[in-house]
Amino acid sequence: MRSSVEIYNVRTGRAREVWQTDRLVEAPNFSPDGSYLLMNGDGLLFRLPLDGGDVVKVDTGFAINCNNDHGISPDGTEIVISDKTEFGKSAIYILPIDGGTPRLITQNLPSYWHGWSPDGRQLAYCGIRDDLFDIYTISVDGGAETRLTHGEGRNDGPDWSADGQWIYFNSSRTGLMQIWRIHPDGTGLEQVTSDNQGNWFAHPSPANDKVLILSYDPSVFDHPRDLDVRLRLMDMDGGNLKTLFELFGGQGTINVPNWSPEGDEFAYVRYFPVKS
């Protein structure tokens, strides 16, 4: 599989490739200063400088089974990862931005990180408890987790709005996977999309005016890789939903927050099968 890391400008409607590799890489995050992308591959994390420099491995200590649920703190000082090295199930850890020893955040497993609150104090994630997929939040210092959803369908992929008022997530509670949102205190649950596509991984823009989502054909269950998918953009309330473009991807394309600091661009991964 060949991976193409690309950046799309929502103002011009143009995309550019910033890196291509024969390895599988996933889920690019923009750094808060916009100078590099953070992504995962082969259980590790890498920085891709956008000035054309070399890709650099991030020291994640003992955590060498990182998945594609990772990100950077709003102030740019820390990295959050989801890794299964220590327990055999995904746990959430925080480590310094330049690498170092991961600090365990979640005691309950498995847990998959997806969002960092704008004030830097809380994490949002998908936790699987008694075979139920639900949305949880927790302090960056660890401690007790707060459950926001309650076992209606599969609930996954939470990401905060820039004003901190909403957590967007995808849920199959009405059948087909759709985008929903809820206040961080667990009130105000609302359905945002209700069309005939399987909608995943809602990422509100830093400008708090648009939400990016990834959409599968309705026949697709879960969020597999290596399929034709669509990246779509909509207003915060789900209005003016439009397809930006189609690509070959899915799992790994935009699993986690991927907007540039200014909110005019986002990063993603497109995949190309390698012929034998």
Where on the chain are the PLM-derived regions?
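Loop/turn-rich, solvent-exposed surfaces of beta-rich toroidal or solenoidal domains
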Residues: 175, 196-232
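Structural motif
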Residues: 2-5, 44-46, 88-93, 132-136, ...
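Beta-strand-rich domains and repeat architectures in extracellular enzymes and scaffolds
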Residues: 1-35, 39-40
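Conserved beta-propeller blade repeats
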Residues: 22-37, 64-79, 108-126, 152-170, ...
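C-terminal closing repeat unit and adjoining cap/tail of repeat-based domains
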Residues: 227-272
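Beta-strand C-termini and the immediately following turn/loop, strongest in propeller blades
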Residues: 37-43, 79-86, 116, 124-130, ...
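Multi-bladed beta-propeller domains
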Residues: 8-24, 50-65, 95-110, 138-156, ...
